[in-house]
Each structure stands twice: as structure tokens, then as C-alpha cells.
Amino acid sequence: MAKKRGKKYQDALKKVDSKKEYAVKDAVQLVKDIAYANFDSTIEVAFNLNVDTKQADQQLRGAVVLPNGTGKDQTVIVFANGENAKAAQEAGADFVGDDDLVEKIQDGWLDFDVAIATPDMMPKVGRLGRVLGPKGLMPNPKTGTVTMDVAKAVSDAKAGQVTYRTDRDGNVAVPFGKVSFDTDKLVENLATLEDIVAKARPASVRGTYIKHASISSTFGPSVTLDLTTF
């Protein structure tokens, strides 16, 4: 049985033409106008792509620093030692460690948003796969979180880097700001995401690549984008 939406959602939904594709700036403004959460809600974009995720070369995964950030303070941890640990601390990492950090997570601590590791630490970090993997926190070279340049990785994470990846149905969902953001800044963030997804088009894909895109705020209805207006 489908979950019945509340009155605030229904009122917001009435302001959206479900048959219309909105120009990007108009869509962003509309989502801001109809947001009703009693906190500064996040705005997210969802791209539906014409990809076969059973094919390894059609699985998208990566990271991008949004020009205007995400509005969220990221708690960043780094698995490193020696000079790399020092560099991570100087770059602003919240927690830096080696075996001690691995043990802390094994004991159930998960109060962080981004995990970064130097390549030599991955055999140890790999033991955390069952914990970090399902939560999307496992360091990965494709997202720039397995790297020797931990200072840059920490700076990027703190500056508003977001990660993206296709789910099994070819969808990519990424947050790109808060309702409180200026409309133009949200549009700039959204355009950055659209550009990175478009450039990541697998060579083997034929026909239309981005089939559909919509944006929504936390709890709010989605608004379909006119992809020609990017």
C-alpha cells in the first residue's frame, strides 16, 4: 500500500505542473519556493541515464567540487601515518589515524562524512569494507579518496566535494546545495554536476544518454528539468 503524503506535500505538489519540463533556473526557484521542511533542507538532483550498469564500462563513479559548496560541514577522517598524517592534519582533517582509527570504526564509530586513505593503508582499511561499503564511505581511487595527496583530498572534501555513482537502474542522485542558497549559486552547482555527468558518458552508449532529470528538496515533490536549458 502506497504511503499517503501529508497536507504540506500535497499543497506543494499542486504548484508543480507534472507534465512540464522546467527551465533550470525556473525549476530551482520553484523548488525553493515550495520547500516546506522546518529546517534548511537539501536540494538534490536525480539523473536517469541510458546505461547498462551490468557492463563495467557503463558504471559511473567519481567526485566533483561544487563551485559554491553544499552548505554542509563535512567531517573528514584520514587513514595515514608519518608525513602524510601531518599533511592531513594541517589541511584540516577532523581525525587522522592508523590502526587506532581502524579499531575505532570496528568498535562502531561512524560519526564522519568522508574517509580518505593513502594507498599503503588500504590493506588495513579493507578490513572495514563490510562497514564502510554499504554506507558509501569506503575510500576509492575513482573518487579521489585513495591518494598520496591527502592535503588536496581533505581540502576538496571540506570545500564541498560531492561523489556520484550510478545505482543498478542507471540513476545518479547528488545533493547540490541548500534551500537557503541564492538561486544563481544553486544553478551554477547544478550546471557543474550536469556537465560532469555529461562528460562521463560511456563511449559504448548509443542514443539519448540523459533520459530524464529532476530536482527536489528534502520531503518535497520533484520538478522535471528541461535538459536543453543547461
Swiss-Prot record:
This protein's record includes keyword Mitochondrion: no
Coiled coil: none
Protein keywords: Repressor, Ribonucleoprotein, Ribosomal protein, RNA-binding, rRNA-binding, Translation regulation, tRNA-binding
GO aspect biological process, one term: translation
Pfam families noted in UniProt: Ribosomal_L1
Domain of life: Bacteria
Record's function text: Binds directly to 23S rRNA. The L1 stalk is quite mobile in the ribosome, and is involved in E site tRNA release.
NCBIfam families xrefs: rplA_bact (TIGR01169)
Stated family: Belongs to the universal ribosomal protein uL1 family.
Subunit structure: Part of the 50S ribosomal subunit.
Protein name according to UniProt: Large ribosomal subunit protein uL1
Species assigned in the record: Limosilactobacillus reuteri subsp. reuteri (strain JCM 1112) (Lactobacillus reuteri)
Gene: rplA
